């Protein structure tokens, strides 16, 4: 196995490298007769697309998606719909600058997958990182746009809630604010602070990490599975598969270790439309199965390892040397990871929805 596929019923296989001709994915398991136009996928891709502000990589990629298979005009309406067969999506790479990486061809970047790819395969694609580049995540976003079409009534949203040691004020959370700043930040005041803060990081040639929060509202109670098919286990695996992610928590997460049983357990009351929870420390999942509350997942993204300051390393021959990375890189890769996290949430939920239908109807 080469481990380029995730999902069970809703399966996504991605392909391509950062500096290759193109990247893409094949989505298998999508039900038939779901309306799907390239423009619907493009909306999500444009949110992740690089070069839209000085706070992301200046690599200029239009990320125009092409649907190669799995769709046709509906015989009744004429609208383009899915056929139930594999959907192949292609995104061409148009702004590669492989020469920027020639000086590190034989050197390993500290904190990067260079060393481990070399250890596993005996070589690695130094040109932009190959498959280990965040460029690959554009394909996940494209797949996530299809997954959203399956999730009728479910709203998946994400936000950047921390950059470096600086956290947002949750009392000022405004979902509408996210579209007004380049950080996907729901706190207007903190977004203004991040602008100056990240400018300083960027101008110094360094980078910084971040924490992102992804939520899903409208997920029906009962979605998921116990033990080895847990919804939260699959969500954690999906988020950990994103480049640069080093930690995942659901609901109260690690803070639950500081709570008593009385504080942590989400008490329940009867309501007109079913059961009402008085809190959501569980993050919308108990025993691997959705409670019907909002699902809340947070993940930590490490600082970009390709930075402009000299670092000590070794080369392929094992000789000690110094490395300074050129090229165009995100000073905070967490910014563009918000749409990626949303996509992975959508893909996992779509997969579990189809599995749920297969088991209980």
UniProtKB/Swiss-Prot annotation:
UniProt remark on cofactor binding: Reduced FMN (FMNH(2)).
SUPFAM superfamilies to which the protein is assigned, alphabetical: Chorismate synthase, AroC (SSF103263)
Cofactor: FMNH2
Gene3D superfamilies xref list: Chorismate synthase AroC
Binding residue positions for FMN: 131-133, 243-244, 287, 302-306, 328
One cellular component term from this protein's GO annotations in UniProt: cytosol
Annotated keywords: Amino-acid biosynthesis, Aromatic amino acid biosynthesis, FAD, Flavoprotein, FMN, Lyase, NADP
Record-listed NADP(+) binding positions: 48, 54
UniProt xrefs under InterPro entries: Chorismate_synth (IPR000453), Chorismate_synth_AroC_sf (IPR035904), Chorismate_synthase_CS (IPR020541)
GO molecular function: chorismate synthase activity; FMN binding
EC number per UniProt: 4.2.3.5
Gene Ontology BP, a term: chorismate biosynthetic process
Main enzyme class: lyase
Pathway involvement of the protein, from the record: Metabolic intermediate biosynthesis; chorismate biosynthesis; chorismate from D-erythrose 4-phosphate and phosphoenolpyruvate: step 7/7
Catalytic activity from the UniProt record: 5-O-(1-carboxyvinyl)-3-phosphoshikimate = chorismate + phosphate
Pfam family, one: Chorismate_synt
Subunit structure comment from the entry: Homotetramer.
Record's function text: This reaction introduces a second double bond into the aromatic ring system.
Protein family per UniProt: Belongs to the chorismate synthase family.
Name the record gives this protein: Chorismate synthase
Organism the protein comes from: Bradyrhizobium sp. (strain BTAi1 / ATCC BAA-1182)
Encoding gene (name): aroC
